[in-house]
Amino acid sequence: MTGFVYRYLAEDHRRLEQLLDLATRDPCRIDASAFLEFRSGLLRHISMEEKILLPAARAAHGDKPLPLAAALRLDHGALAALLVLTPTTTTIKAIRTILEAHNPKEEGPEGIYSQCENLPGFNSGVILERLRNAQAVAMNDYIDSPIAVASARNAVVRAGYDSGMLNGL
């Protein structure tokens, strides 16, 4: 059985997937407006997990992080680093690859969302309200400098993914 927090965050995953699909519907061009909405939404989603969900889980778990938290944080770092770069077919493919591996870590039967909601002391109602009220993340313009590309590549590798997925950048 899934709880309120699980459903809220999983539904947000579906919304983000739809936005990314919309942004890439035309194989010849990326819909900049749809991608910008995806970018903003994914950064907000990551922020909700990093600033609300994972700290609440840690507090409910005797001030110890859940075992999956470290891997999720590495994935979040890789995704955020990729969102710094101007979207291209290469960066979008990398984002999709990471999300395809990442989302089951959160939504799966043993995923972090279920783990959180099963913790004694994890108040789903309070956490859900905080998630709903989470603010958008401020975004800067895209940066495609060699340092930004290297940072994205390093974040992807730290998270355990193949840096070759960024070949051509």
Give, region by region, the residue ranges found by the protein language model.
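Small-residue-biased structural context
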Residues: M1-L169
